[in-house]
């Protein structure tokens, strides 16, 4: 099964509403979202945390971009178990989840990003997390991989460039092998 958990920045970059990313990055995000609409599974949480974040940051009722249209498609298909899997995640404290595989690593994550990891880990197939623009994930992907969760960096050159700008005194971490 081809399933994925999709970080919100993939939708935002596909919309062209996340500044500082290359045309190639935007095209990649657009292509991956369009491919996902044609085939494969999107994994979200059953309490709609991910869908609420998507809705808050996009315009599914007035779609102008591919990310908006993707969310509209996702909302229309959320009850279709062949295209959307919903998993339960258990909040244990504000922004923390029992399904997050590593408590120490969870402390390093932005609270808004923790749900993506918890959802991937709660799903029986441990689907990859699509990540396009958040450079902090470069510091986390190796620990996540040790827990059985892969991070698929859709825009590796862009995310490494963002990392270099944010952390000029540190070399960008390596990327996962393709």
Name what the model sees in each region:
Residues 1-2, 62-66, 177-178:
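An acidic, glycine-rich, mixed-charge low-complexity segment common to nucleic-acid enzymes
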Residues 16-24, 57-61, 102-107:
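Short, flexible/disordered intra-domain loops and linkers
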Residues 83-129:
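Active-site neighborhoods of divalent-metal-dependent phosphate/nucleic-acid chemistry enzymes
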